[in-house]
């Protein structure tokens, strides 16, 4: 069957997005073809995303020079969380528990992929340390995330900054029998009195 070229073009564009395969892309394209108001709203949102760029201070997404978090005077500027990505920053923000500032590295150390310290936003991090009392290394619990945290801990301690790592353990609502050994071990190491 021959489809209109504009529908094919939209389907191809949608299928290049992460998590969207060809069938989902086609369903979305067909939906938009029959729901013009939603298509218009999406087009407007896509036009607006062109204004988004990296915050010059932390690497978060911003529509101006600084992101809303860096502009927020109520944030604790003595506390800095280092994350691998903007998605990680958003995950911490959703918790509502962290009131400091962030620094986005733009990845994790991965020598096999050619990602060393020079490929990450480390110089920006080191420039931001004035007035910072504690850096929380909130990198992933992967080999790369752990390597990045160890490297940064060494570098930051040389600069006289207190370095911490989030406690890792069991998820709320999770069953012990399904937890892996490493998670259980970390949960037991980080136990606290009740």
UniProtKB/Swiss-Prot annotation:
Q: Which SUPFAM superfamilies match?
A: Recombination protein RecR (SSF111304)
Q: Boundaries of each Toprim domain copy?
A: 78-171
Q: Which PROSITE patterns match?
A: RECR (PS01300), TOPRIM (PS50880)
Recite the UniProt keywords alphabetically: DNA damage, DNA recombination, DNA repair, Metal-binding, Zinc, Zinc-finger
GO BP terms: DNA recombination; DNA repair
Zn finger limits (C4-type):
55-70
What are the protein's GO molecular function terms?
DNA binding; zinc ion binding
Q: Where are the transmembrane segments?
A: none
Q: What the protein does?
A: May play a role in DNA repair. It seems to be involved in an RecBC-independent recombinational process of DNA repair. It may act with RecF and RecO.
Which family, according to the similarity comment?
Belongs to the RecR family.
- Which protein are we looking at? Recombination protein RecR
Originating organism: Thermus thermophilus (strain ATCC 27634 / DSM 579 / HB8)
Taxonomic lineage of the native organism: Bacteria, Thermotogati, Deinococcota, Deinococci, Thermales
